[in-house]
Amino acid sequence: KRVMLERDILASTNHPFIVTMYRAMQTKDRLYFFLQYCPGGEFFRMLRRQPKKRIPESYAKFYASEILLAIEYLHLLGFIYRDLKPENILVHMSGHLMLADFGLARCQTSSGKDGKPLQGVSPGIQRRKNRSKKSGFEVPRLSNGRASNIVSGGRNRTNRSGNCFSRLCGGGSHVLGEDSPVVDTESQLDSQNGANRAMSFVGTVEYIAPEVIENKGYAGSVDWWTFGILLFEMLHGTTPFKGKDTDDTFANIYLGDFEFPRSIQTSEECKDLLRLLLAKEMKDRLTSPHIIRDHPFFHGVNWALLRNQKPPIIPEVRHPLDTRNFRSFKD
């Protein structure tokens, strides 16, 4: 069942930061995916080759921008990724990142099945100044009090013809205007008063969100938690809640606070974003891709031209079929 869903998701997507499936072929007992080859290997291995297994904040901002757009796109199609981590991200020969491995992904069947875009515009926006207890970043709210997921209107965000990337990303910095239509992706993914929430205990130990451990049900919020964990790992070479064993790690995730190592210089903007992404309560977590993009940490990112920019690290690739950046597997 999972592998068939993975096939359906790959067949539904068309995005510059998601690996492309060219064809799927099924035999009597096997299913084959013909996927875009990324000779840069796993992003995990690329990180491990860096000094102290971490990268500068400017590099992390670039890579986080690409993954943010990929996750936003999946949510707009009604999919929850559920297993974001460096091992599931591939590096294109150009150095850009490609999200891969949808084996744990979930389709929220009430909205977005078969790759259909989420429908639904919020009836209104109430402009309030809502500040996180630990943050000076203002989070716009809907009239129902939920954090809003605001996108600029008038664009087909899932049209597979032409350059879907420019339609997806828009141009430059967005202004949260009074008349901007709202697509609340988290409300759509978490529709029916939570009746369609996922309950499965899936994911990677150090990346699992508190609501998964608590078994309270979840939707797209888990992807923004793991996005925060990924950003932290890029900057610090380790995950923020790692314990001596699985139980200790779960206890840290559910009950503990994370700290920023004093030995590593991290901007206040980055710290603020991480606190918002790693809020333990789903209602307190930043789950709006548009508002995340507008956070001061991402100031200066040209979203519309991101894929045309030169990545910070270019993998060593001598020819298109080079395998040097992948692990060797013995029979």
Where are these regions (language model features)?
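Conserved N-lobe beta3->alphaC-helix segment of eukaryotic protein kinase catalytic domains
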Residues: K1-N14
